[in-house]
Amino acid sequence: SDILCLNSFENLFHQNFSSNIAGVVSDHDSMLNYAQKAFNLNSNYYFNSGFLIINLINWEKNNISDKAISLLLNKNNFKYYDQDVLNLLLANKTLLLEKKYNTIYHLADMNTPISNDTIFLHYSGSVKPWQSWGQYHFLTSLWLKYKNNSPWKNVPILQPQTYKQAKFMTRMSYRNKKFIKSIYWYIKYSFWKIKSKLKV
């Protein structure tokens, strides 16, 4: 999973949903700009669907599941699929929760500490803590601590399998001054990319 639970979430069960369908946490402002341009989202925020607390009665009453599937089958301009569709269907029908319930963190381009009151830490974005190119980030050690106490403790960390992943590995190795490793993965990246283009 790309989400860790770090503190109690008991207070979530005491939220007053009223007529709202779900409790959500807003994503970065850039995502709202994207949604407003891509599919005319009529809302003051765009939420991340990695975390939702759903009022099942209101969800069923509004037939959200069927509507979501229908939209996904009939429209092809959704970049983030279920997340875009849910933002469209639940616009102005959600309870906005504090950031601590879904602290969105990008290992590729963020390097700030998280708040002590973080409840759910969400490793969002393309770089994940179970990937070898995500191992240099200080927050990966937190994820590894939980992995090593789980039934998956012996599952190996994922190594690059594609030229795009090798490019990430090259960049992250260089950024962390692992220059020999960076050169090694740059050569791999170049070879794999050429090989993939020749197949087309």
Range-by-range predicted roles:
Residues 1, 7-11, 33-37, 62-68, ...:
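A short secondary-structure junction signal
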Residues 1-30, 44, 53-54:
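GT-A fold catalytic core of metal-dependent nucleotide-sugar glycosyltransferases
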Residues 6-14, 38-41, 82-85, 104-111:
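Intrinsically disordered, low-complexity boundary segments flanking structured domains
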Residues 15-17, 44-46, 89, 112-113:
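A generic structural signal for short, solvent-exposed coil/turn residues
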Residues 18-43, 135, 139-145, 149-150:
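A short, conserved beta-to-alpha structural element at the edge of catalytic cores
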Residues 20, 48-50, 83, 117-118:
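Short, surface-exposed beta-edge/turn micro-motifs
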Residues 40-51, 78:
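A recurrent flexible, glycine/aromatic-enriched loop bordering the glycosyltransferase active site
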Residues 56-200:
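A glycosyltransferase accessory/donor-loop signature
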